[in-house]
Amino acid sequence: MAASNQSEVNIGMVGHVDHGKTSLTRKLTGVWTDTHSEELKRGISIRLGYADCEIKKCETCDEPECYTVDKKCDACGGKVDTLRKISFVDAPGHETLMATMLSGASLMDGAILVIAASEECPQPQTKEHLMALDALGVEHILIVQNKIDLVTEEAAIENYNQIKEFTKGTVAENAPIIPVSAHHGANLDVLLKAIQEFIPTPKRDETLTPKLYVARSFDVNKPGSEIKDLKGGVIGGSIIQGALKVGDDLEIRPGIKVTEGNKTHWVPIITKIISLGVGNKKLKTASPGGLIGVGTELDPNLTKSDALSGSLAGLPGTLPETLEKMVIKPQLLERVVGSQDELIIEPLKTNEVLMLNVGTSTTVGVTVSARADKAEIKLKLPVCADKGDRVAISRKIGSRWRLIGYGIIL
């Protein structure tokens, strides 16, 4: 277990809309991640939601009953030891919010694909989310067959067989399938045991220069606050390498758009780290793993309403260049997933508009040149990314962006 209050691993909660991702996250963490007013109204996740939990184990009970997230053993009421703290990234399942799911996938060390037993499998975004995990290199996957309380045993077995058939030949072919009722809390102990066994904590190298993927940014000041009480802007995200500490200077790229005459360019933002936190707990140093809040000296106007989400942050002078165009080696899927007609994917074409996700950023670009092994794309919004980074590629088909593959930055 990590010595600090930090989580050790980020696990994505993905799957089709309304299959129970947010309910399962709440059952494991006690946190309802849909807190945005529009989310509460519509009953779906719109932004990425985050919540932490500690996996604990009873010293005396047998497996899997010995696993819990509570302060005492659910089976015997006895003492429990904390094994690991984990962060869940709850991604939206609605097809119009695929870009948000893709930007969240870059934070994931593993994923739980939630599939409702009460609907035929696969549903469109079940397919699309699994392809996205594959495209972005998320390998450690568990499948939760949720809502088993709503179906007969025969229907649950039929749905299980559909899941096995659907995952054949994918990154999740050998993933354990765990029947669960998030609503009733049934089989959560089995799920916790599987998380411990199948989603390992990645090996982290804290000696590398720090890099933080920014997934959210906020103005934490309440309207009408006195000037003397105002706090600087807050950014939230995941450190992917190295460590940051309170007092460090921080560079955020791409930064601010500056227009001079008829030319525009982007200027990195430099600020200082005032505080680091996980939930309500303060840290002096933050390392990879979990989702971190970083308090800064920035004008809160720069951070409000996720204005800096998609940025990359690190020590000044250590970040990669900001790219206004990128050259990638594309790897396209055979067919479009997530739509009714699974069309064959055509090669990239010159002058076509694509949506690209790299790290936590989403941008749109136009292909300047396109060959089978190399494509050059001019970006509408620049990104800060390294050579070798993976980029998810989506194409507009009908009125929706559809994932068509990924590329490696050359």
Curated annotation (Swiss-Prot):
For binding GTP, which residues are annotated in this chain's numbering? Answer: D18, H19, G20, K21, T22, S23, N146, K147, I148, D149, S181, A182, H183
Annotated catalysed reactions: GTP + H2O = GDP + phosphate + H(+)
The segment annotated G1 runs over 15-22
One BP annotation, GO? formation of translation preinitiation complex
The residues that the entry says bind Zn(2+) are C58, C61, C73, C76
The record's listing under Pfam families reads:
eIF2_C, GTP_EFTU
Q: Which InterPro entries does UniProt cross-reference here?
A: eIF2G (IPR050543), eIF2g_C (IPR015256), eIF2g_dom_2 (IPR044127), eIF2g_GTP-bd (IPR044128), P-loop_NTPase (IPR027417), Small_GTP-bd (IPR005225), T_Tr_GTP-bd_dom (IPR000795), TIF2_gsu (IPR022424)
Q: EC number(s) for this protein?
A: 3.6.5.3
Q: Where is this region: G3?
A: 90-93
Annotated keywords: GTP-binding, Hydrolase, Initiation factor, Magnesium, Metal-binding, Nucleotide-binding, Protein biosynthesis, Zinc
> Which is one Gene Ontology cellular component term of this protein?
cytosol
Kindly list the positions annotated as binding Mg(2+) 2.
Answer: D18, G43
Region annotation G4: where it falls in the sequence: 146-149
Identify which cofactors the protein needs according to its UniProt entry: Mg(2+)
Gene3D superfamilies from the xrefs? P-loop containing nucleotide triphosphate hydrolases, Translation factors
Region G5: which residues? Answer: 181-183
**Example GO molecular function:** translation elongation factor activity
Q: Which parts of the sequence bind Mg(2+) 1? A: T22, S45
**G2, as annotated region:** 43-47
Which part of the chain is the tr-type G domain? 6-203
Q: What does this protein do?
A: eIF-2 functions in the early steps of protein synthesis by forming a ternary complex with GTP and initiator tRNA.
Q: Which family does it belong to?
A: Belongs to the TRAFAC class translation factor GTPase superfamily. Classic translation factor GTPase family. EIF2G subfamily.
Checking HAMAP family in the record gives: eIF_2_gamma
Q: How does it assemble?
A: Heterotrimer composed of an alpha, a beta and a gamma chain.
What is the name attached to this protein's record?
A: Translation initiation factor 2 subunit gamma
